[in-house]
């Protein structure tokens, strides 16, 4: 899967689960997760954990 498709899927899940605006997400976060080989589901779970714990 290419990065753009991966990013669209991850963003759609975040918007659906949090109601946040897409522009609220840091792009560097997604690049790092993609480069680390995470699936978009793993990246979303990690993002939400970091968001709700205050790390973001």
Where are these regions (language model features)?
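C-terminal alpha-helical interaction appendages
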Residues: 1-56
